[in-house]
Amino acid sequence: MADLAKLVDDLSALTVLEAAELSKLLEEKWGVSAAAPVAVAAVAAGAAAPAAEEQTEFDVILTDAGEKKINVIKEVRAITGLGLKEAKDLVEAAPKSVKDGVSKDEAEKIKKVLEEAGAKVQVK
């Protein structure tokens, strides 16, 4: 049991990058994929979705960068995790989707942040 407790402590001390690397190594060693259970859950959620009438996933669309394009690029980078060039390309290619399949609350937060930066945004 002491070995298991030490293992738990060691795993808890890992950084996110180290945990991701560990996951890859275990997948290779055991010949499995960590993505399989997620796909099953997504299929189950997709099957239940037609029963619900209310939309649960929203897309945030940047329709115009406005006058303060630099501020909008900064916020797009923060929201999406894109690099500077990719965020700039996305902003300049408006109308363009910033984030897809997010909850209503998250979509509204993203819309508010982008509008405060000077952009025009649509939530679909």
Swiss-Prot record:
Q: Which GO terms describe its biological process?
A: translation
* MF annotations from Gene Ontology: mRNA binding; structural constituent of ribosome
Q: Which InterPro entries match?
A: Ribosomal_bL12, Ribosomal_bL12_C, Ribosomal_bL12_C/ClpS-like, Ribosomal_bL12_oligo, Ribosomal_bL12_oligo_N_sf
Provide the assembly information.
Homodimer. Part of the ribosomal stalk of the 50S ribosomal subunit. Forms a multimeric L10(L12)X complex, where L10 forms an elongated spine to which 2 to 4 L12 dimers bind in a sequential fashion. Binds GTP-bound translation factors.
Give the family per the record.
Answer: Belongs to the bacterial ribosomal protein bL12 family.
What is this protein's function per UniProt? Forms part of the ribosomal stalk which helps the ribosome interact with GTP-bound translation factors. Is thus essential for accurate translation.
Q: What is this protein called?
A: Large ribosomal subunit protein bL12
The organism is: Paramagnetospirillum magneticum (strain ATCC 700264 / AMB-1)
